[in-house]
Amino acid sequence: MQSKADFIYQARPARVIFGAGSLHHLEREVVELGAERAIVLCTPEQRALAQDVIDRLGSRGAGIYDRATMHVPLEIARDARAFASSCGADCAIAIGGGSTVGLGKAIALESSLPILAIPTTYAGSEMTPIYGVTDGGIKRTGTDMRVLPKTVIYDPELTVTLPVELSVASGINAIAHAAEGLYANNANPVMSLIAEEGIRALAKGLPGVRRDGGDLRARSDALYGAWLCGMVLGNVGMALHHKLCHTLGGSFNLPHAQTHTVVLPHALAYNAAHAPDAMRRIARAIGADDAARGLYDLARDNGAPVALKVLGMKETDLDRAADLAVANPYWNPRPVEREALRVLLQYAFEGAPPRIYKT
C-alpha cells in the first residue's frame, strides 16, 4: 500500500525567461534554439504585435500567420501547418493567449517544429504538453511531449493592454489548473506547493490589475502565478472542471477563459466533500473561509462573468451539455453523476453562488 509520501514527479523541460522587458531577449532565444527561419503565430487582433516580433527577428523572421482562433479548429491547424512548410520554417513563435499557443502545438504535433511561446494572457497552455483540436463541434485533447514549448518568454509589459475583465477571467482560468491539480489522482507534494503559491500570487495580483490595468507589479504577480499554475496543469491530471469546460467550449463555442471562470466555483463545490485538503489549501491561498465561494466572489467582485447565460449559452442546451460531460468516463474525486451535474450547470447558467450539488 502506498503512503501519502509515495509519489512520482517528472520535471518538464522548458526554458523560462521572466521579467518586464524580457521580449528584448527574443532573438537571443531563437538563436539558442538553433533556428534560422521562424514564423510568428497570432490572432487577427494581435497582428501588430506579431509584426513587432518579426521586426525584432530581422532576417530570421519568415512570416506571420494571423488566423489563430478559439479551440483550434482542425481546418485552421492544417492551414497553419501548410503555411509553416511553405515558409521553410524551423521554429514557430506563438504570441498571444491559449488560442495562439494551441495553434502552435497543433503545428508541432505533426511537424515536431520547436515552439517559442510569448504569453500575453494567463492561460498557462505554454507550460503543458496538452493539445486540443476541434473537429465537427467536438474538442479532442491529448498529451504529447512534442507540443511542449521549448522556450517561454514571460514579459509582464505585454499583458498591460489585456482588458481588465478578460485579465481577471484569464487569471481565474489559471487558478483552475492549480485547483484541480491539488486533488488530481496523480497529485504530488512538489506540484501541490507550486499550485498553492500560484493561486496565492494570482489572488494577490488580480485585484490590483482590476484597480489599475497598467500596474506592472500587479501584472507581474498575476503572470508569475499563471506560470506556476500552468506548470501544475502540465504535470498532473485534471478532472470534472476541465472536462466540463472542454465540453462547453468545444461543443457550444463558449469563450475559454470566461467559461473556466464561471464553472470553477461550482466544480469545486461539487468535489468539496471528497477533496477537503485541496479545499483548505485553495481557501488559504485566496484568503477565504470557503474555496468555492471565495473564487466566486473573486470573479464577481473584480468584474468577471459568473453566469453561463451571459456567455451565450442557451438554457435549452444544458441537458445536452450534461449528457456530453458524462459520455466518456474520467477520473474525479467524486463520482460524476448526471443528475447532480445537470443541477450544477443550471446554477452556473444562472450565475447563482455555488452550493453542495446532490443527486
Whereabouts are the PLM-identified features?
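ATP/NTP phosphate-donor binding region
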Residues: 1-90, 308
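A glycine/threonine-rich phosphate-anchoring loop and its flanking beta-alpha core
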Residues: 14, 24, 28, 109-193, ...
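Structural motif
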Residues: 15, 37-39, 63, 90-93, ...
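Short glycine/serine/threonine-rich phosphate/pyrophosphate-binding segments
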Residues: 23-26, 46-50, 74, 99-106, ...
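A short, small-residue-rich loop immediately preceding and capping a beta-strand
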Residues: 84-107, 111-122, 244
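Active-site segments that bind and position negatively charged phosphate/pyrophosphate groups
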Residues: 181, 185-294
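C-terminal charged capping/lid subdomain of soluble metabolic enzymes
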Residues: 285-359
